[in-house]
Amino acid sequence: MTNEYLAPFVDELFNLGVREAVFSPGSRSTALAMLFEEYKKYDTYVNIDERSAAFFALGIAKANRRPVVLVCTSGSAAAHHFPAITEAKMSRIPLIILTADRPAELQFVGAPQTLDQTRFFGNFVNHFENLEAPQPQAKNFWTYPRKVAQRAFLSALDQMAGPVQINVPLRDPLVPKLKSENYEKGRYKLPFKFFKGQQSAFFDEALLSSKTLILAGANSAENYSESLLKLAEQLKAPILADPLSNLRNHNSPFVMDSYDAFLANDDLKTDLKAESILLFGQMPVSKRLQQFIALNDEAQFIQVDPALVYRNPSLTTTIMVQSNVTTFANSIQKVNQDFSYLEKWQKAQEKMRHQLEKVAQEENPFEGRFVQELQKHLKALDAQLLVSNSMEIRDIDYWWEKEDSKVRILGNRGVNGIDGTESTALGIATTGKPTVLLTGDLSMLHDLNGLIIGKTHELNLTIVLFNNDGGGIFHHLAQKGVPNFDYLFSTPHGLNFEGLAELTGLDYHLVSNYADFGQQFETSICQPGIHLLEIKTDKDLSLALHKKYTAYEN
């Protein structure tokens, strides 16, 4: 197999609504031109001049108000598209430009008709992506091209429509095998759809199932929690609430907070399978939840977002809705009277929460109990809690329990890095509200110089530091036990945070036990300045305790 994977790409674009394709002759683009033509459903046009071809495609898109495919060969051909691309960008006209290219091994070696086509049109396109040839035995060989087609189509029609570049590196043989059955490969049982604004009748039909699940990720939209709680009550749907969604500030029977733990149970995963899934905000942090979504690959997966961008790495999205959460929730007319699916989730939640709460009896220094202690002392405050990535956000995911509260939990989950946490926390602290940073030792070391601005501007911040002397998260991952594990992954540093606190002018305290933590935290949160409460833990002991308290027993 060489370029057969492009057939589903052609099919998916047609299914989405593309009807016209414009080609300029070329060798490297042979497969693209032939596959579009042999599909026999497109209106195709050939123009020997790429510059003219691009403006011709622009005219079609302008007249019909829908994306048009524009195909060219490798090398200088794409450069001739540039004038029309700039016009499309500024006029907000949707085009999908497919630039055939030489494969990676022929780049930068003097191969003819070859130049760097990466992001060739710069800021004049809404989206750029390489459509690489997937591995022949890959599970997603036929579905991956469809996802690329969906992203291209959605990006071309986003809030500000415009051109999109999909760069297609192609290897010899360039002439494709024209098998009509290839066009249908990788099709989903539920065809992909997208909507802008309200489509209440369609969504009422899509949500006919009584097994509807709501995923609530981080989202700063106004009335986010209230809208989802209203929708959940209407649909009798459990809400799997990521800690950054702040839905755990509501002690609602619809809110689930311990799902990451109990979704480790295979029997439960089967029993809790959904028929409709609604995603709002970012995908929650839980890896087990993402695995559960992949298991529900026959469910109707509806992503609701103001922007037409993917937020589901399991690649199971069937419907994209460009809408804010309140508008969408208000458009749903369906009312479900069947509580049985919700009750299954509530039963698992209650059982798991009972197990997690046993950590309150733990005497060894353990992150899970310290998170519970932190929540207890923050409960009465109108406070802000920034949580660093790596293990800390996962500790919060496991141990932060739903309750009526005003604590706003924040995190940098855009690209999930561990840098910049102190600086971000101090930026949050400028609001004047009580502000806490929960961080790990490596995260803190990445941004020590960020503390300077806090001293300069006399900001107030309490830092709760889990120091396990290195990368504790790797003790939970597949790297645990590999050769040179400590050297390559765990990376113990042995640094003295008391000395670092003295260097940066922080008020420092080494926490000795849980009672000491409570006393020191209550003192620091009420006093001005930057306070560092260091909690030393052991990576191996923490792993053992984590397994002990998160085990779900049938």
Swiss-Prot record:
Keywords: Magnesium, Manganese, Menaquinone biosynthesis, Metal-binding, Thiamine pyrophosphate, Transferase
Pathway the protein acts in: Quinol/quinone metabolism; 1,4-dihydroxy-2-naphthoate biosynthesis; 1,4-dihydroxy-2-naphthoate from chorismate: step 2/7; Quinol/quinone metabolism; menaquinone biosynthesis
GO terms of biological process kind: menaquinone biosynthetic process
The organism's place on the tree of life at top rank: Bacteria
Chain segments annotated as transmembrane: none
NCBIfam families: menD
The protein's role, per its UniProt record: Catalyzes the thiamine diphosphate-dependent decarboxylation of 2-oxoglutarate and the subsequent addition of the resulting succinic semialdehyde-thiamine pyrophosphate anion to isochorismate to yield 2-succinyl-5-enolpyruvyl-6-hydroxy-3-cyclohexene-1-carboxylate (SEPHCHC).
Listed name of the protein: 2-succinyl-5-enolpyruvyl-6-hydroxy-3-cyclohexene-1-carboxylate synthase
The organism of origin for this protein: Lactococcus lactis subsp. cremoris (strain SK11)
